[in-house]
């Protein structure tokens, strides 16, 4: 994705001297990471060249909005760009008149906005995880939890602590053949999209010729936050059975 030429280089013989990315705030870097995570070419389901082109252009615009300081969150934008000669509206308004572009633009921003939403029954810290009780029935201990936030389908189980755990839509089902007297931790992580074109995070520039070239950014930052989410389970008190 091209980065706008709104930052100056300090000038150095060191090929790693570019400071455009370094000059971004931490908030901008976080937003940029999300845009690249859910945008082109990391976005899953690009079936045609029309899809790829629209997704590429939408990702590029969002990157520009972030690095120019126009976008402060997935839902907050103050586009201060001027209309191109012969056209009306801001840079964002002009691009969003194309329905194919707008579809991917909206989808990328929606995924960015929901990235840090956790299932309603889980929290972000294991030490504060709520404890749920599994009930005994039909020879096993079970528990079913429904996610009121509607985001569970975008998570996977990364730690089960010996409990059988499955995700189906917005329903989490936990099963154990043995009693669990001391609560154990269940950990869920956000699914990060990956395609055959996904790469590591890179900033591209031409050292010594920065003024005549536009910097590029590609790939997905390796420190992408999987949004770990925690809950704990145990078997209901008084229901521990002696197996002979």
What are these regions, as identified by a protein language model?
Residues 1-116:
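Short, surface-exposed polybasic-aromatic patches that bind anionic ligands, especially phosphate groups
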Residues 119-125:
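Long amphipathic N-terminal alpha/beta scaffold segment
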Residues 125-151:
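Solvent-exposed, low-complexity, repeat-rich "mucin-like" stalks and linkers
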Residues 170-185:
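Extracellular/luminal low-complexity segments enriched in Ser/Thr/Pro
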Residues 181-206:
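Short, aromatic- and glycine-rich surface loops/edge beta-strands on solvent-exposed regions
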Residues 218-229, 235:
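Long, compositionally biased, intrinsically disordered
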Residues 242-244:
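Conserved small/polar residues in nucleotide/adenosyl-binding loops
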């Amino acid at each position: 994705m091209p980065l706008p030429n709104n930052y100056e280089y300090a000038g150095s013989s060191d090929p790693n001297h570019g400071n455009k990315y370094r000059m971004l705030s931490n908030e901008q870097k976080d937003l940029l990471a999300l845009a690249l995570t859910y945008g082109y070419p990391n976005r899953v389901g690009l079936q045609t060249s029309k899809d790829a082109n629209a997704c590429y252009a939408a990702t590029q615009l969002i990157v520009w909005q972030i690095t120019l300081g126009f976008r402060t969150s997935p839902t907050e934008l103050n586009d201060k760009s001027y209309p191109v000669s012969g056209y009306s509206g801001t840079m964002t308004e002009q691009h969003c008149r194309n329905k194919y572009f707008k579809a991917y633009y909206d989808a990328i921003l929606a995924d960015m906005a929901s990235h840090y939403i956790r299932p309603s029954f889980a929290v972000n810290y294991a030490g504060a995880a709520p404890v749920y009780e599994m009930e005994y029935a039909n020879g096993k201990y079970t528990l079913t939890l429904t996610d009121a936030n509607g985001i569970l389908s975008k998570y996977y189980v990364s730690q089960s602590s010996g409990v059988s755990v499955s995700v189906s839509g917005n329903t989490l089902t936990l099963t154990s053949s043995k009693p669990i007297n001391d609560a154990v931790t269940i950990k869920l992580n956000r699914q990060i999209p990956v395609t055959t074109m996904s790469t590591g995070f890179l900033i591209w520039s031409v050292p010594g010729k920065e003024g005549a070239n536009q910097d590029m950014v590609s790939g997905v930052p390796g420190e992408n936050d999987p949004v770990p989410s925690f809950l704990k389970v145990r078997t209901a008190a008084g229901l521990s059975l002696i197996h002979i």
